[in-house]
Regions:
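Hydrophobic alpha-helical membrane segments
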Residues: 1-234
């Protein structure tokens, strides 16, 4: 397939708008899909030590599932609920490779955070006793936040579009990652604008006792498909 286009940053509004239009076609089923994935993530998160790594890996399959049903909604106006698990039936190996990369990034992030905290606040025993200087705690916290942000941005740049490209275009992992990176690097303005809008929507969704997230979360899960369509086909 062709390489991604460079588009105006203002197209980010179209990506959010396209996701909203898709959501309105079958809101109930999409909310149900998001709730199911949420329950799965909560269950995985309760597994000691490896829960976070499994969440990072499975999220790729969730994004692929939403990309697939987004295409079904766009073309047919509906989807079968079981199609949210399409990634476990098709292109499973390729998605698993991307998921494994996500798990490794999560592991590196966690280990680096521990090293930063221990290195800046002293030995573990003093940390356990909370015998810490306020400035040290703040410095450690800011360092961890900065590291997590950098790793998150880099990982997202390489993988944001990869699940859609794998499940919809049968792209191999290496090329899917390359195309995702090209899409990001050629549309940094749009990526930043889109991220800010998604963050704002998430915050707004939290206001009414988190009930707004029932709408916001499944809608945001459709955004990667909207970006994929705009960058590669318009």
């Amino acid at each position: 397939m062709a390489e991604p286009q460079a588009l105006p940053a203002g197209n980010a509004k179209e990506w959010i708008g396209a996701a909203w239009r898709l959501f309105k076609l079958r809101p109930g089923k999409l909310i149900g899909a998001a709730l199911l994935f949420g329950a799965i993530n909560i269950g995985l998160g309760m597994i000691p030590y490896i829960g976070g790594l499994l969440q990072a890996a499975i999220s790729i399959f969730e994004i692929a599932g939403f990309a697939f049903i987004a295409k079904q909604l766009e073309e047919e106006g509906d989807f079968e609920f079981g199609q949210i698990f399409i990634g476990f039936q098709e292109n499973t190996k390729s998605l698993a490779i991307i998921g494994a990369i996500g798990a490794v990034v999560a592991l590196i992030s966690n280990l680096a955070a521990i090293i930063l905290i221990v290195g800046q606040v002293g030995d573990v025993s003093s940390a356990a006793n909370l015998d810490l200087d306020e400035a040290q705690m703040m410095s450690a916290g800011l360092s961890v936040m900065a590291l997590s942000l950098i790793l998150g941005i880099v990982y997202s740049a390489f993988t944001f579009l990869a699940p859609a490209l794998i499940i919809l275009e049968n792209e191999p992992p290496k090329r899917a990652i390359l195309l995702s990176w090209q899409g990001f690097s050629r549309n940094i303005g749009g990526a930043v604008f889109c991220s800010l809008m998604m963050g704002l929507l998430f915050i707004v969704g939290m206001i009414p006792i988190f009930l707004g997230l029932l709408v916001v979360m499944p809608m945001l899960m459709l955004v990667p498909y909207a970006v994929y369509r705009d960058l590669f086909f318009k």
